[in-house]
Amino acid sequence: MTSFVEANEIVTIICYHALEKRKKMKLERLKKNNLARNMVIVLLVVGIISAIILTFTKAKYKTAESIPLVNGTINYELSDLNLIGVYIEDGSSYTKTDQIPDSGYTLNAEKSYCKIGEEKQDTTITYDMNTKTLNIAPMTTKGTKCYLYFDEQKTLLADAIKRDKTVKTRSLPLTTSSKVEDSTTGTIYKAQDDWGDTYYFAGNPTDNWVRFAGFYWRIIRINGDGSIRMIYNGTSTATTGTTTMINNGASQAFNSSYDRSEYVGYMYTSGQQHGNTTDSPIKDVVDSWYSSNLANYSDKISKEAGFCGDRNMASGSSWSSTPSSTIYYAARERLYTNKTPTLKCSNSADLYTVSGSSKGNKALTNPVGLITADEVAMAGGVYGQTNQSYYLYNNQYYWTMSPFNFNATSGFAYVFYVYSNGYLHYDSVNNAWGVRPVINLAHDVVIKSGNGSSSTPYEI
């Protein structure tokens, strides 16, 4: 039989367990309530963040605008661009238009600007004519107005010459069978000079005409430094006659002195093979003509390119001022014997340049000279072979600046010249023939108009 004390202990234990059970149930309910509350809080936070992101996204993209172009549209982002004024170059001024030009113009970034009210802003403006993409940065202030100025796209003469041309190379030697005398319009030939790749005309092209400083010129080649070499053709596009030479074809001796080897030099020094202290009479004539007719255009004439009067000797010849036997210069060996002309100048003392050039003898006062016999040969004037169908033919006699020989028997110095029927020949320096100056236009010269034909020459 259970005692009172034992019964009391049993009741106490039962009550304790019941109490513990109620505590556990209450704790579990509390945990469930806390979990539900936390889930609600998380959902609220996620909702708020999503709303913020959505708001900023809408704010960002609702400012996208478009500018109408000639073809298509370009998109850009901005805060509030009220106006874009578009101006295109029209001669010496600008004309306002209602659309960005489709081609033929480039953005003048220095002249273009944006402003807020009356205050100009420090912005960077770029425009890609190919992709039709306009960029304005920064663009963050409402009421911004931008003004875009477009300049007519300039075409470099060198680019215009090479545009749509077929580039060819020619194999040496240049024999009679390789003489170029046919129409070569649309063709230009590649070789090497002292500056790199050079592109020259040969045969009878009709697309190598330039009008510069009031005169017509024929392009000889694009030099390796990018300048453009040209020979004088006169005040008209007539290709024959005395008007294709300066001073209306007045004849000029290369040098009035003739009885020493050094007199073959465009410049010379008594007793020296490569001296350059004295001007030849023909150089005096060329310089005088330049000073009277081209000096005011000197900013468009190259100070880098030069003119080669090669005084190196041919194989088997040794230089002497008054040799006892005939001596020959290297150009005679190249053009008469081997038919292998070159546009490189093997001795820097014979490359006539002005002081501003990086190459040559820097002896010239004016950046003007004469054509070389090698250039005549590469154009089509093969030694001793008549050619009246190439662009250097003018039915006249005129000098080159390339030495030929010193004849010990006659006691005369000889220089190459172009014969009246178009081929290369030689004559004593004291004889008088025509003069056709050669200049090099600067590599960055642009054209106003023209396609290189005689009726529409490249206008500088």
Explain the meaning of each model-derived region:
Residues 31, 35-86, 451:
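Short, polar/proline-rich extracytoplasmic segments that appear immediately after membrane translocation
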Residues 6-8, 15, 36, 348, ...:
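Intrinsically disordered, low-complexity peptide-like regions
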Residues 41-42, 52, 80-460:
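Long, domain-scale functional regions
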Residues 2-34:
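N-terminal Lys/Arg-rich, disordered targeting/topogenic segments
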